A protein has these predicted regions:
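A charged N-terminal "starter" segment
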Residues: 1-115, 121-135, 150, 181-187, ...
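Generic secondary-structure signature for well-ordered alpha-helical cores
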Residues: 21, 36, 40-44, 132, ...
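Active-site-proximal loop/turn and secondary-structure-junction residues that shape catalytic pockets
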Residues: 56-58, 79, 100-102, 120-122, ...
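ATP-grasp fold ATP-binding core
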Residues: 136-142
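Charged (often Lys/Glu-rich) extended helix/loop segments that serve as interaction or gating elements
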Residues: 261, 265, 269-428
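Conserved, mostly hydrophobic/aromatic
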Residues: 31, 55, 77, 109, ...
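Conserved beta-strand positions
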Residues: 75, 96, 118, 193-196, ...
Length: 428
């Protein structure tokens, strides 16, 4: 699909007058419209709810926007629970999916009345001991082996290997866990699974749904447990590369509906509510990292140096992930120069792009790095003493709003404020 910025050069310059680069910027209109498409795609299911994965974009203003559009939140830590509570999410508006869970995290989830999703069979006794067993509870499923989807000339295209993942229970462990939970007072049950990441295929969710729907029928028959909810989790991806095709959420929703009618309805389970956790799909395309070119270097390769670095967007350095780059104001110029676009970390993998064909770039140009609305700012870090950059909301009316200020040296040193010789750093 064609990669178009939601900011023009003039719009970016207007923001820069208030908020220096680098910063992440989010498109409120795009996010709201996308959530409405998701809700429409699954409107056939009366209990449907999107639980936005907080880890994808843990900004309270964004979470409040999503709440207004009917979303819940998917949390996996104490601080994500605290953030969600502060944004007004309570009870079953919260899904708590964690692994190797600390006591205080589990207790907070129980206190908030969140749906608790148990990652392991041993968590049944752990939950009862540290908090209590709620009447409604989920268990996470891991089918093992290799998840395969689609066919090519070479045969099945492998998408992921659940058998190598640390998450979830076997089917027999789930059956045993449901039986124990029923004995301890649980009355309604959910199933959750995540089998593949960032899939660019309308077939993924329907195929996952079929696996979980059949599992639900078997588990209910084996235990007598009332399966009330099935959480398809995340995995629906976005087209980071221009040559990739955008997922059609309406086709995905219809595919899941067909599996629902084919498998659950004949089993007398037509009242099951469907949940999702599409963090990346929900906000990913509606965020960008805006950065200024501050250096150029000409040695064995041509380098463009930015005021942003991997501390502001980790994915290219960590995964070798592709993020499209637009030089604002030069959208219609030929991409006839080959560059490595880099940041200033003392690590050679601090590269936003390698051998990327772009228009001729000059110092002072503004670069728009696409698709940072999920797992962008959220994965920021402080290595090399680099500071987290600001976050800005492009509002529906075209105005902009600071929704997270940039980190300062005082913030960076805050955990050292008890050391006497560090006090000069905190003096105004």
């Amino acid at each position: 699909m064609e990669k178009k910025p939601f900011l023009t050069e003039a719009m970016a310059q207007e923001i820069i007058e208030d908020v220096p680069t680098p910063f992440h910027v989010y498109d409120e209109k795009g996010i709201r419209e996308n959530v409405r498409r998701i809700n429409k795609a699954f409107s056939w299911n009366k209990g449907f709810k999107e639980y936005f994965a907080v880890k994808a974009l843990p900004n309270p203003v964004i979470l409040q926007i999503l709440k207004e559009e009917g979303c819940g939140v998917d949390c996996s830590s104490l601080t994500e629970l605290m953030l969600s509570e502060a944004c007004g999410f309570t009870g079953h508006e919260i899904m708590f999916s964690s692994n190797q869970t600390p006591v205080e995290d589990m207790q907070k989830a129980y206190e908030l009345g969140a749906y608790i999703n148990l990652d392991d069979a041993t968590m049944v006794e752990f939950l009862e001991r540290v908090a209590g067993v709620p009447q409604e509870i989920f268990c996470r499923y891991n089918p093992g082996g290799t998840f395969q989807l689609g066919e090519s000339e070479e045969g099945f295209q492998v998408m992921d290997k659940p058998g190598d993942a640390k998450y979830g229970m076997t089917e027999q462990q789930m059956i045993d866990s449901y039986k124990k939970l029923m004995q301890k007072g649980a009355k309604q049950f959910g199933i959750h699974a995540f089998l593949a990441s960032n899939t660019i295929s309308d077939a993924y969710y329907p195929e996952l749904a079929a696996i979980l729907f059949r599992l639900a029928v078997r588990v209910q028959q084996a235990t007598g447990a009332h399966i009330s909810y099935i959480n398809l989790s995340g995995g629906v991806g976005i087209p980071y590369r221009p040559e990739q095709t955008e997922n059609d959420i309406m086709a995905i929703g219809e595919g899941v509906r067909k599996k629902f009618e084919e498998i659950l309805v004949p089993a007398g389970m037509g009242d099951v509510a469907i949940f999702s956790e599409m963090g990346r799909f929900t906000t990913g395309p509606y965020g960008a990292l805006v950065s200024t070119v501050i250096h150029e270097k000409h040695i064995y390769k041509e380098y463009i140096g930015l005021d942003a670095c991997a501390a502001n967007l980790m994915r290219p350095a960590m995964y070798g992930a592709y993020h499209h780059i637009t030089v604002l104001g030069k959208e219609n110029e030929p991409c006839d120069h080959k560059y490595d676009v880099v940041g200033g970390l003392c690590e050679n993998n601090d590269k936003f792009a390698v051998d990327r064909m772009l228009p001729k770039i000059d110092i002072g140009d503004i670069l728009y790095i696409h698709d940072t609305g999920a797992h962008g700012s959220a994965m920021g870090y402080n290595y090399n003493g680099k500071l987290h950059c600001a976050e800005v909301l492009l509002c529906e009316d075209g105005s902009h709003r600071l929704i997270r200020r940039a980190q300062t040296p005082r913030d960076y040193f805050a955990t050292l404020d008890f050391l006497p010789f560090m006090k000069p750093l905190f003096e105004d």
